């Protein structure tokens, strides 16, 4: 297994895309650490991974808190070793029309989706620079490229994450660290399952491959990007959207 001996932190790993990414990396031999504000959910996923023979642990993590993030990274290096892989997946939505959007909803989405990735990447880079290796993957979104009605805050956070990824990649490349973004389209998760059937059908009509994506589609892309097969790929945004945006 290619990731044997690797330590991988996945934020927002308790459910959805993060859970599937965690399971996939564990199958390849990594010790996955699920950082999530939903600690009970993270522990449940950890138990499932361990039940299949994988290595996993859970930590409670509020990615928008600098103190929380530093504490988690300090504990990783104390209990294991410097982190090898970080997947910044934690994210939320608070949708609403721009003219009606509350400042608190703008701030919350930007703090978790963008600031959280900055804080985790900053701590990861400090550890990775010392060992002159590592991979950081930021989970962006198709919405960060094309925008979406009623998602000014979410779109801004994901567009910012894409720009952040490119700058991060330039800064850490001389130390042997790679950074890429994965931009999923509309994926069949809790976020899309709440949509009305008619809305889902209209979305699918816009997708050339005629289906919503599955979390596994995103996880396989992440697994490729953290592998040695992608050793010459950095600063890129990989779209996983069924052709909805080309």
Name what the model sees in each region.
Residues 2, 121, 211-240, 244-245:
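C-terminal substrate-recognition "lid" of short-chain dehydrogenase/reductases
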Residues 39-40, 60-71, 103, 216-217:
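The beta1-alpha1 cofactor-binding region of Rossmann-like NAD(H)/NADP(H)-dependent oxidoreductases
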Residues 2-33, 168:
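Canonical Rossmann dinucleotide-binding motif of NAD(H)/NADP(H)-dependent dehydrogenases/reductases
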Residues 97-98, 102-110, 192, 203:
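Substrate-binding pocket helix/loop in short-chain dehydrogenase/reductase
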Residues 141:
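Residue(s) in the substrate-gating loop at a strand-loop-helix junction
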Residues 126, 170-174, 231:
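Alpha-helical segment proximal to the catalytic Tyr-Lys
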Residues 121, 157, 165:
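Active-site helix of classical SDR
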């Amino acid at each position: 297994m290619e990731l044997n001996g690797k330590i991988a932190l996945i934020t927002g790993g308790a459910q959805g895309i993060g859970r599937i990414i965690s399971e996939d990396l564990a199958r390849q031999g990594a010790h996955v650490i699920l950082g999530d504000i939903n600690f009970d959910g993270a522990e449940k996923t950890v138990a499932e991974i361990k039940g299949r023979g994988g290595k996993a642990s859970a930590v409670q993590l509020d990615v928008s808190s600098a103190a929380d993030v530093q504490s988690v990274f300090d504990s990783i290096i104390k209990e294991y070793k410097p982190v090898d892989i970080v997947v910044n997946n934690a994210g939320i939505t608070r949708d609403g029309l721009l003219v009606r959007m509350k400042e608190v909803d703008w701030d919350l989405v930007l703090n978790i989706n963008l600031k959280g990735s900055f804080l985790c990447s900053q701590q990861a880079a400090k550890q990775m620079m010392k060992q002159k290796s590592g991979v950081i993957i930021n989970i962006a979104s198709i919405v960060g490229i094309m925008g979406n009605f009623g998602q000014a805050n979410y779109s801004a956070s994901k567009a910012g994450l894409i720009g952040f990824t490119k700058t991060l990649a330039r800064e850490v490349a001389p130390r042997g660290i790679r950074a890429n973004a994965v931009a999923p389209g509309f994926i069949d998760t809790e976020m899309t399952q709440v949509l009305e059937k008619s809305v889902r059908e209209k979305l699918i009509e816009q997708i050339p491959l005629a289906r919503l994506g599955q979390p596994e589609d995103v996880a396989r892309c992440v697994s490729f990007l953290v592998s040695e097969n992608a050793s010459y790929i950095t600063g890129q945004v990989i779209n996983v959207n069924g052709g909805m945006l080309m």
